[in-house]
Amino acid sequence: MKKNHNIILPVVLSGGSGTRLWPLSRELYPKQLLPLVDEKTMLQNTVTRLEGIADLGPPLIICNESHRFMVAEQLRLINVRPSAVLLEPVGRNTAPAVAIAALQAMKGGADPVLLVLPADHVIKDFAAFHSAVDEGARLANSGSLITFGVVPDRPETGYGYIKKGKQIKPVQGSKLTVQSSSKKRVQGSILDIGHRTLNVAFKVDRFEEKPDLAKAKKLISSGEYLWNSGMFMFRASRYLDELRRFAPDILSSCRKTLKGAVRDLDFTRLDSEAFAGCRSDSIDYAVMEKTGCAVVIPLEAGWNDIGSWSALWEVLQKDNDGNAVAGDVITKDVSNSFIYAGSRLVAAIGLKGHIIIETADAVLVAGKDEAQKVKNIVAHLKSQKRGEALLHRRVNRPWGSYESIDSSDRFQVKRITVNPGACLSLQKHHHRAEHWIVVKGTARITKGSEVITITENESTYIPLGTMHRLENPGKIPLELIEVQSGSYLGEDDIERFDDRYGRKGTNK
């Protein structure tokens, strides 16, 4: 990090599991890594919408260590090189995550303004967002801790609320940006005067928990409340100062966590023991509700946190009957519904306000007004140790992917795809043998002390306990069918001896 105190450093929080968007979102393939609203994933959209912000530095990403290769690949596909990718061994909410990001950002004497962004939000009006960020940077430079409050358009029970306090004067030197509107609006985030606009900001009076519907209606009707977006802006040192004041135990744990961090390829792996001992808390509870320097900038930019299937339905394009559909879908007498077909035809008749989500291994059917309860299904699946809560049939790996086609107690059939030039780890299994049949491309196979090459329609056998490795030496993807047989077929029956992706040792 350069010693440029004027730089804005985006801190992208990509550690969530997105349980309310099951079955499309899974613990090992969460919603921020999915293309939910267009061809880009939520993470990619979060990063690319920052283009055009002045004094912007390369983003710092915080993610679960299980997602690291998918995060790196998605950033590579949009030609973004992050300043760092910090790997959380466990989730500890936003206050510790941002503390570690701030400590990392200040290495070498820098003290940037942090722009803290969840990786799974939708923002449609980039110009309005950039204008709010510009004003946030100026206020952050004056010592304020900024949160962005979304101007509400309906009573909402799924968000927390922020009560606006006294309006603060614009920071000297604030820019006026050109807009097409000439009307004057006072209640929202922007004052339109002629063809010039200026963001306004308020002291934070207080934060409100997620209300019930009756209270939400009262909050909205008062005109004094905004939705809590979970986006923040402050100088790194100011956040750490306030954290030291209000949650010194969190700051101490985070210092130990970063001190014990190790470099792992292009990632920074945080000290798991130190981080596990850190108290879990949000920025709101740990700092923003206690500091006297909290400022809220109202935001009208087409924001949505995509916190449920009904929220996603709201932002998607709909037909004349109010239906949002994706995939091979046929409807008759269906209205105000969201239907997603991931792997086969889905037909629906006589439905109103429903959600149907079809994937290769699970189907969700729910009333749209019950969308928040999907997380209860995921909790039940986890309690039953069902794999559908964790991953899809198709699982991405740094070398390619595999898809489970069929399985029983003592056998499993997988379709494996290995990218050109990629290879799996040198490994062995203690409880299963494997048959490999190549259906496309060329495979170089290490089997004990033997190295062989096989091509389409050829096969080989890997006995139980045999050291082996699979490589793709060709220029096209390698596809093969793997038939596993044995007493135990779990993915944790892999003992690795050499791995180019840093996954040495037993895979647990």
Residue locations for each model-derived region?
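Short, basic, low-complexity termini and linkers enriched in Ser/Thr/Gly/Pro
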Residues: M1-K3, P170-V200, T506-K508
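Conserved N-terminal catalytic core of the sugar/cofactor nucleotidyltransferase
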Residues: M1-V12, R20-P30, P35-P118, V122-A128, ...
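Left-handed beta-helix
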Residues: K2-I7, S237-I437, T442-Y461, H468, ...
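Short coil/turn connectors at secondary-structure junctions
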Residues: N6-I8, L56-G57, V80-P82, G109-P112, ...
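Residue-level signal for inorganic ion chemistry
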Residues: L43, A101, D120, I162, ...
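A residue-level structural signature of the nucleotidyltransferase/glycosyltransferase Rossmann-like core
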Residues: L114, D205, M231-F232, N304, ...
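Conserved core of the sugar-phosphate nucleotidyltransferase
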Residues: D125-V171, L198-L265, R269-F275, V295
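Noncatalytic nucleic-acid binding interfaces
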Residues: L480
